[in-house]
A protein has these predicted regions:
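Domain-scale signature associated with acetyltransferase and cell-envelope carbohydrate enzymes
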Residues: 1-93, 114, 120-122, 129-131, ...
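Histidine-centered beta-alpha loop that forms part of the nucleotide-sugar donor binding/catalytic region
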Residues: 97
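Short glycine/proline- and charge-enriched loop/turn segments
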Residues: 100-110, 174
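Active-site-proximal flexible loops/turns
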Residues: 101, 105, 128, 168
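Short hydrophobic beta-strand segments in globular cytosolic domains
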Residues: 126, 132, 144, 149-150, ...
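C-terminal/domain-terminus segments
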Residues: 136-160
Length: 174
């Protein structure tokens, strides 16, 4: 019914955990949630938020991941691998939250489109980045600060910008 709690979690400040009845939130050991400005020099502007929006939603986080004032919302499924670091105030959302048309919003304001997000192992997401629905972030990729990611990112690449574009591939040993 609740959130699967694992060993070694470190929580700074008060994160917001919003779990819809029937949904699933699980995080591996070694999770770090930084919701307190004094815990990180980049000072999060709000607490970490981990949220599921409906009964079928799944949010899974692997081992040894860290979040600073980040927001992760699963309307369908957000899967985050191991050793993923999410920078200050970044947002990961697999939903539009509401329909895009006025008619759709009038019919059901909360019926926004969803597509799963997959974040593979060893990914780094820079501060203020936005990861949108349907995206896969490949293993060991880096998302630059302030980037808006609406398309898949290949493994071992650096992307930046709005929309995010490949800047370069990571060299061996980087």
């Amino acid at each position: 019914q609740g959130i699967a709690w694992k060993s070694g979690w470190r929580i700074f400040g008060r994160p917001i955990l919003q779990k819809h009845r029937g949904s699933h939130i699980e995080a591996g050991p070694g999770l770090v949630l930084r919701s307190w400005p004094r815990s990180n020099p980049l000072s999060p502007t709000h607490p970490v938020v981990l949220s599921t929006r409906n009964a079928d939603a799944e949010l899974t986080i692997g081992a040894d991941c860290g979040f600073t004032g980040a927001v992760v919302v699963a309307g369908e499924r957000v899967s985050i691998g191991n050793r993923v670091q999410v920078g200050g105030n970044a947002q990961i959302v697999d939903t539009d939250f509401h329909p895009l048309t006025p008619e759709g919003r009038a019919a059901d304001f909360n019926a926004g489109a969803t597509r799963p997000i997959t974040i593979e192992d060893d990914v780094f997401i820079g501060m203020n980045a936005l990861i949108l629905k349907g995206v896969t972030l490949g293993e060991s990729c880096v998302v630059g600060a302030g980037s808006v990611v609406s398309r898949d990112v290949p493994p071992r690449t650096i992307v930046a910008g709005n929309p995010a574009q490949v800047v370069r591939e990571l060299r061996e040993g980087e």
